[in-house]
């Protein structure tokens, strides 16, 4: 079933066109990776889905509803959570309190139920339970990434947008983060991610889209992308930039 369908998506900033008629589909239960060089439009795609890009055109349909042009708050309520690059946690709040902020759109849910769900998030992510009362300024980069993803999941999204979840992390921590991404899909959440590490991204993704200068270059299963000589040479030889 198509959960997200993008047709002819355009986005423009002052410097010019960032997205130039992008088509993209995400089926329910998938992990889909957006790959490509720096400035290709990957992060802008996630921001456009989330209602964070003002000058957009085309069509973005989520669960059969047109969402392009809606406010971010309305998009979150429909079931889309966006974990941006840089994590953007509140350093003066504890791990637990940062996670609970992810449920700010669920005002009708009782506090006791939200606390129970926060407990589930703390148990789901390695190491977070013992850190629940620690302030986020004291965490490592990997721990902060886990908190950011847990906060996104507190919104109970059908679609989780992850923008460069491995940014600035050591290789062993990156592997841990992507094991969590696989587990997130296994618990029923669809994932669309932007990633600079093609090896790791395609190890968990069902399909990938390679963008170039704001347009789709090629898409396919990981094995299809790896077997494409042009794509492999240009973008998948380690994919040093995003």
Identify the residue ranges that each predicted region occupies:
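ABC ATPase C-loop
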Residues: 152-153
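Helix-to-loop junction immediately C-terminal to a conserved catalytic motif
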Residues: 50
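Conserved ABC transporter NBD signature motif
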Residues: 58-67, 78, 112-118
């Amino acid at each position: 079933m198509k959960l997200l369908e993008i047709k002819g998506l355009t986005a423009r900033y002052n410097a010019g066109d960032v997205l130039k008629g992008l088509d993209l589909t995400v089926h329910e239960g998938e992990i889909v990776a957006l790959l490509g060089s720096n400035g290709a439009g990957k992060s802008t795609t996630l921001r456009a889905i989330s209602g964070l890009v003002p000058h957009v055109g085309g069509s973005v349909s989520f669960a059969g509803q047109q969402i392009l042009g809606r406010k971010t708050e309305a998009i979150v309520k429909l079931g889309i959570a966006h974990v941006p690059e840089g994590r953007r946690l509140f350093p003066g709040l504890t791990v637990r309190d940062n996670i609970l902020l992810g449920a700010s759109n669920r005002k009708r849910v009782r506090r006791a139920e939200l606390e129970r769900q926060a407990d589930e998030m703390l148990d789901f992510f390695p190491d977070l339970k013992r850190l629940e009362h620690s302030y986020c300024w004291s965490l490592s980069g990997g721990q902060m990434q886990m908190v950011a993803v847990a906060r996104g999941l507190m919104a109970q999204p059908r679609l989780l947008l992850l923008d460069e979840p491995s940014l600035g992390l050591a290789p062993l921590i990156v592997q841990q983060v992507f094991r969590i991404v696989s587990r997130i899909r296994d618990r029923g959440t669809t994932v669309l991610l932007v990633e600079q590490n093609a090896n790791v991204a395609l190890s968990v993704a069902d399909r990938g889209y390679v963008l170039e200068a704001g347009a789709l270059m090629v898409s396919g299963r990981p094995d299809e992308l790896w077997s494409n000589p042009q794509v492999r040479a240009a973008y998948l030889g380690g994919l040093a930039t995003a």
